[in-house]
C-alpha cells in the first residue's frame, strides 16, 4: 500500500511542480544569455570591444554574488511563492530595459542590476525541490528541471536569431526587439507564480489528506535522519564542503556562460547570418538535454555523485580544447556539443550533494553560497575570453583558460570525496519496483 501511495504522490507532485519550474528556468536562462545574440550587432552599433562586452556580460554575476545569500534566506522566511514572483517580475523589467542601453556605463549598470534582480532564483528552486522530493529522487528531478537550460538554447537560439532579423522595424534595432520581447514572459510568469506555487507540502490542497500526510511524514523523517546535519546559517556558510562545492561550481559556471555568451560569436566567425547562427547554436542543446537526464538517472540508480561530476567536467574541458582547433562549422559544432553535454551532465549530481549534509537555514545559506561564489565563474570566464580575444585576436587562449578551470573542478570534486566525505559521495540508490 505504501509503495502505491509513494508512487502516486511522487507522480502527482512531479507533474504539478516540475514542468512549471522548468518553464521559469527556461525564461531565466534565456534572459541571462540572450546577450550573446545581441552582441552580433549591438557591439558594432554601440562601439563595444570584446573586452567591454565580456565584462558587461559577466558583471551580471557580480550583482548575483552580492545579493544571492540574503535573497535565499528571505525566500526561506517568506516562502517560495512570494519571493520567486518578486524575483521574476523585477528581472523581467530590468531585462526589458536592456533594449535602451546607450553606451558602456548603462550596459554595465543594467547587467549588474539584472544580476541583483535575479539573485536567489536558482538556489531558491533547488531549496524548494528539497521540500518536496526525497534525497534519493532529487538528482533525477533536478536534472529534469535543469534541462530547461539546454532547452532554452535549443528553442531560444532560433527565436533570438529570428528576432535579430527585425532590425529597423519601428526604428528599433533587432537586438532591442529581442530584449523587449524576451523580457515579457518573466513578468507574466511572475504574476502566475503567486497563484500557482505552493510553499510547503503542508499547504498542498491539491494532494489528498493521505497523500499530504505521507509526504510530510516522509520529508520530516528524512530531515530527522540527518542526525549531525547542520542547521544554523553560520554552519551552512562555514562548512568546508560548501566552499569546495562552490569552487567546483565556479569552473562549471565559467564553462556554461562562456558557452552561452560567446558561442554565437564563435559560430558567427564562419560568415553566417544571425538566423543561421541561431539554428546551429541550438543543435548541441538537443544532445545535452538527453544526456543530462540519462546521466542523472544513472547517478540516482547507482547512488554515486562524485565520478558523475568528475567525468562530466573533464568531457566539457576536452570539448573546449577541441574548439580551439575547429576549422569548420561542423568541427566547431562537435566541440560545442561536447561542452554542452559535459556542463549539463555535471549539474544534477553536483546540486544533489549540498542537501545531503545541510538542512533548514543552513541549507538555504549553503546552497546560496555555492551558487553565488560559483557563479562568479560566469564573470571570470566570459570576461577573460573577451580580454584574451582583444589581446591575441583569437578565442583559443580564453577557451584553454576555461578548460583549465573545469579540470580544477574535477580535481576538487575528487579531493572533496576523500577528505570531507558524506557517505563517500554516495546516497542510497533508488529502488525500482
UniProtKB/Swiss-Prot annotation:
Stretches assigned to coiled coil: none
Keywords, sorted A to Z: Cell membrane, Membrane, Plasmid, Transmembrane, Transmembrane helix, Transport
Induction record: By tartrate.
Top-rank taxon: Bacteria
One function term, GO molecular function aspect: transmembrane transporter activity
InterPro entries reported for this sequence: MFS, MFS_dom, MFS_trans_sf
A UniProt-annotated Pfam family: MFS_1
GO cellular component term, pick one: plasma membrane
Membrane topology: Multi-pass membrane protein
Presence of keyword 4Fe-4S: no
Entry's transmembrane regions: 17-37, 47-67, 82-102, 113-133, 139-159, 177-197, 242-262, 275-295, 314-334, 350-370, 395-415
Localization, UniProt: Cell membrane
Location, primary (coarse class): membrane
Job description of the protein: Component of the tartrate utilization system and may allow entry of tartrate and tartrate dehydrogenase.
Record family assignment: Belongs to the major facilitator superfamily. Phthalate permease family.
Protein name in the entry: Putative tartrate transporter
Organism: Agrobacterium vitis (Rhizobium vitis)
Amino acid at each position: 500500500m505504501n509503495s502505491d501511495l509513494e508512487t502516486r504522490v511522487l507522480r502527482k507532485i512531479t507533474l504539478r511542480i516540475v514542468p512549471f519550474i522548468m518553464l521559469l528556468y527556461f525564461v531565466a536562462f534565456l534572459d541571462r544569455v540572450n546577450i550573446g545574440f545581441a552582441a552580433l550587432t549591438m557591439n558594432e552599433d554601440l562601439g563595444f570591444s570584446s573586452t567591454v562586452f565580456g565584462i558587461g556580460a559577466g558583471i551580471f554575476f557580480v550583482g548575483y554574488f552580492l545579493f544571492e545569500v540574503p535573497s535565499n534566506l528571505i525566500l526561506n522566511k517568506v516562502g517560495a511563492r512570494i519571493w520567486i514572483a518578486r524575483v521574476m517580475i523585477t528581472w523581467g523589467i530590468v531585462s526589458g530595459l536592456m533594449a535602451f542601453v546607450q553606451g558602456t556605463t548603462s550596459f554595465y549598470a543594467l547587467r549588474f542590476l539584472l544580476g541583483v534582480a535575479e539573485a536567489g532564483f536558482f538556489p531558491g528552486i533547488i531549496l524548494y525541490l528539497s521540500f518536496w522530493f526525497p534525497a534519493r529522487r532529487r538528482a533525477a528531478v533536478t536534472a529534469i528541471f535543469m534541462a530547461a537550460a539546454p532547452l532554452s538554447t535549443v528553442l531560444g537560439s532560433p527565436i533570438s536569431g529570428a528576432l535579430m532579423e527585425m532590425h529597423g522595424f519601428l526604428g528599433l534595432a533587432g537586438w532591442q526587439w529581442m530584449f523587449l520581447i524576451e523580457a515579457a514572459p518573466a513578468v507574466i510568469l511572475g504574476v502566475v507564480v503567486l497563484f500557482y506555487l505552493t510553499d510547503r507540502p503542508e499547504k498542498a490542497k491539491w494532494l489528498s489528506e493521505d497523500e499530504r500526510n505521507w509526504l510530510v511524514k516522509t520529508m520530516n523523517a528524512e530531515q530527522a535522519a540527518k542526525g549531525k546535519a547542520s542547521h544554523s546559517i553560520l554552519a551552512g556558510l562555514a562548512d568546508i564542503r560548501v566552499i569546495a562545492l562552490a569552487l567546483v561550481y565556479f569552473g562549471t559556471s565559467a564553462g556554461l556562460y562562456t558557452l552561452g555568451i560567446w558561442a554565437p560569436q564563435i559560430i558567427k566567425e564562419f560568415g553566417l547570418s544571425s538566423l543561421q547562427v541561431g539554428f546551429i547554436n541550438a543543435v548541441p542543446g538537443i544532445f545535452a538535454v538527453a544526456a543530462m537526464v540519462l546521466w542523472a538517472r544513472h547517478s540516482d540508480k547507482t547512488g554515486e555523485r562524485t565520478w558523475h561530476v568528475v567525468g562530466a567536467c573533464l568531457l566539457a574541458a576536452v570539448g573546449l580544447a577541441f574548439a580551439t582547433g575547429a576549422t569548420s562549422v561542423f568541427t566547431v559544432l562537435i566541440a560545442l556539443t561536447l561542452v554542452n553535454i559535459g556542463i549539463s551532465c555535471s549539474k544534477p549530481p553536483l546540486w544533489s550533494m549540498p542537501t545531503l549534509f545541510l538542512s533548514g537555514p543552513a541549507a538555504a545559506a549553503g546552497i546560496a553560497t555555492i551558487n553565488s561564489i560559483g557563479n562568479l565563474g560566469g564573470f571570470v570566464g566570459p570576461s577573460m575570453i573577451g580580454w584574451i580575444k582583444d589581446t591575441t585576436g583569437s578565442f583559443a587562449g580564453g577557451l584553454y583558460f576555461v578548460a583549465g578551470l573545469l579540470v580544477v573542478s574535477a580535481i576538487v570534486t575528487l579531493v572533496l570525496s576523500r577528505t570531507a566525505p558524506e557517505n563517500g559521495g554516495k546516497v542510497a540508490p533508488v529502488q525500482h519496483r
